[in-house]
């Protein structure tokens, strides 16, 4: 470096002694060369080994080639003069491969060997506080006088096993249990309340009568057995009874259907046809009687009879309905036939106490036509009613009263 600096100083002194004309020519030539592809000229001059600038300078001034300095050399010299830039540090420091707990304990206890420190770390399972206390006791035994040694091993809480994912059926079952507890809690509370009240009453009784303890114990056992029977055994019994009834019903129905198929379905068609007509005739009057009885069984309002001014029932033309019969009170007429009479039997001593037949008259149909009864013509009605007419109208003849006339219905 010192030799190069000496060469630079000598070259600068020589340049200062060159006349001004030479400097002007050099500046012109250098400006032209740099503006018009200076790189190409420099390359060609480097290949040929005869740069143009040096030739012109040598021709005009007669300076040696060794004394001339090119601009490339000047740039190199300037770079050598400036100090190199410092290397950039990496932003991310590489993590140390050594265990940080081990390194920390080494720094805290440099006097102890590394194997003891590792043994303490293994025993403490990486917990710093017990490891630090153990290493402190190794370095200074007097510091561990106040520390009590454990007599029993430390119990660790068992880690809960990984909960497996529940299926849809399990989720539904869990939800059903929650709903049952929520909505049926009232029934359970009522039951617990009843038990509490019973227990209170029984305790009061025991205080008054200490002999009832044994009886209370027996009663409690009976209640427990009864509650167990109602809650567990009764549903099973009901299920079994229902199943047995269903089975028996199915068996009976199958047996009846088989018997019907054997006896009735495969019967003789001729017997069915013979008895069919008779059965139909026997059943018809019963059906009619039932229908009539059903009609008559209904309550009916009594019919109201209406009579006209002549004492005749309205809507009935027959004489019998009027309640009037015509007969001769004097006896039989001459033309009418007298019915025959049976001879009377004399009573004997042997026949006393026996029933004797008496003569009876036998009615015979009348051959002659009887006279029909005709009603009397009505009386003329006065347009102007008077007291006499009104009284006469209101009065009734006792012979015309329907209740005093002997009718066929009363007979």
From Swiss-Prot:
| Cross-link Glycyl lysine isopeptide (Lys-Gly) (interchain with G-Cter in ubiquitin), sequence positions | 15, 59, 76, 156, 354, 396
Q: What biological process terms from GO does the record include?
A: autophagy; cellular response to nitrogen starvation; ubiquitin-dependent protein catabolic process
Which residues are in coiled coils? none
Which residues are recorded with the post-translational modification Phosphothreonine?
70, 167, 346, 352, 364, 367
Instruction: Enumerate the subcellular locations listed in this protein's record, separating them with semicolons.
Output: Cytoplasm
Q: What miscellaneous comment appears in this entry?
A: Present with 623 molecules/cell in log phase SD medium.
- The identity of this protein, by name, is Ubiquitin-binding protein CUE5
What is the organism field in this record? Saccharomyces cerevisiae (strain ATCC 204508 / S288c) (Baker's yeast)
